[in-house]
Amino acid sequence: MQHKDTAVAKDTAKKRLLRRNSAPSAIHIISRLDKKWSFLWNTIDRHNIVEEQDESSAAKSEEEHEDDYELEQLLNMIRIPMFLEKFMLFALLTSLDCFLYYFTVLPIRLIKGYVKQFKSYRQHYRLQQRSGHKNKIPFRYRITSREYKERCMIFIIVISSILLSKLDTSKLYHRIKRQSTMKLYMLFSVLEMADKMLASLGQSLLTVMLSRKNSERILLHKCLLVSMSLTYVTIHGYVLVYQAISLNIAVNSYSNALLTLLLSMQFAEIKSSVLKKFDKEGFFQITIADVVERFKLTLLLSITGLRNLQSWSSSLSNTSINFWSPRSTLSIVINILCGPMVSVVGSEVLVDWAKHAYITKFNRIRPQIYDKFYYIIYKDYSTRTHKLEDRLGLPLPAFVVLFIVMVRPTLFKSSEPSYLPSLFRILFMGASVFLLALLAKFTLDLILIKWSKRIEQRFRDQAFNTVVTEEEYVPGLLSGGMGKVDVSTRIALHSDYNKENRIETESVSPMRKRKTTLTAECTPPSLNDIRRQKDSKNPRSLENVARYKMVSKRIW
């Protein structure tokens, strides 16, 4: 019994000893947790102290209004469509005025020049009759440089239209329609690139051919330049005919695959241009490119609408007259003419809004810079020269050839079931189209003249110029990447640890005191400094911007 009692006593003593040893371990764990929580709170407090120190430092004083600037940028993105569409509307109307010039004013001037030449010939013939037949002087009429330009342009347009009128557009339509979606995507891309390359080449070629020096060259050089220009206009017109038929297929397809493909190509412009660094010249050039793109889309869709309207009217003539009603006819006509424009041009407008809004945001540009573009286009239009056409890079002769080739069969097919003779019907349709174009040109000129007077009065009161200053930019740091680097960080990144011009910064810690020498001499200029130096070096550089001129890193 005594042995059992001693064993039980030993076990009890061991348990008590274990309890005593376990109690301090729990206390130790709690104390360690306390230390961790205190370290965490000290870290949070330290971050708060650092933020308070940063807010009170001199480096933060320049960025104290950064929130206001960010709010201004958001408001500018909302205001961009108003400024952009005002510029676009004026530029598109002036482009349409230049386009109608080839159908109205140019033929009138050509006829006037030939009438003047005929009158001089008749006057010379009468003088020869009065003086007798003894001293015969051969008749020589020296044409002016303007008459030479007009005759060359009419000759090129007429011959190119005759050559391209031999194309069977229905065969081209079905040949393109049979292709797969991937091939059509490649076709759209190739035609777009070919259009830009030919437009750039044609602008230089036509400028040389229509120059004043060319009218004084020998006949061989003149014929060579005219033949080269004729070849260019014919090839460019052929490319534009392919573009018009491809767009017609995409718009008229029963499935939305081709139209979706076309819209996706438009939205691809955002990816290629938004996340880029722009200067004022590049921004003006991409705005001009958007004007040309929208004008070309409107022209191609107008041709598509006229061809669809002609095919619908021919199918309507084969049906019974009992199914016709004015309300249904008007709705069908509106659907044919306005349906493609709403989908394609509407998406183009939305893409332009988003693209310009983000370009101005990333490059910290205020929308008032569109007034500079607006004023430059107004000055080009008011001079009544080809400067506007050269700045915009509009291939108007190729557009005129495209319109004649695609619309001429439509107009004459619509008048086929007529009792009039064929020649008289052609003359009647030609005269009707000419009078309508002349009326549109006259109305458009009145609108633009009135608009130009308002622009002149507005900018005269403000003493406006095309110089871009710091007022056209939102204050703040520009960045080539996704983040921003302030001045002190840039100095630290580009420090050279030299002895000259060093800046000593001390960071005191409880353990030790450390000195770091930073050099501001070797720090390269920031993006803001580069832009400021470039603007001050050439303040009126916007006036030298053209569509196909390398004024920035690339041509848009």
UniProtKB/Swiss-Prot annotation:
It is a multi-pass membrane protein. Belongs to the TAPT1 family. This is Endoplasmic reticulum membrane protein 65. One of its GO terms (biological process) is protein folding in endoplasmic reticulum. Glycans are attached at residue 318. InterPro entries: Tatp1. The chain crosses the membrane at residues 88-108, 152-172, 225-245, 331-351, 392-412, 429-449. Interacts with SLP1. PANTHER family: TRANSMEMBRANE ANTERIOR POSTERIOR TRANSFORMATION PROTEIN 1 HOMOLOG (PTHR13317:SF4). Keywords: Endoplasmic reticulum, Glycoprotein, Membrane, Mitochondrion, Phosphoprotein, Transmembrane, Transmembrane helix. It is found in: Endoplasmic reticulum membrane; Mitochondrion. GO terms for cellular component: cell periphery; endoplasmic reticulum; endoplasmic reticulum membrane; mitochondrion. The modification Phosphoserine is found at residue 22. Residues 109-151, 246-330, 413-428 are lumenal. Residues 1-87, 173-224, 352-391, 450-556 are cytoplasmic. May be involved in membrane protein folding.
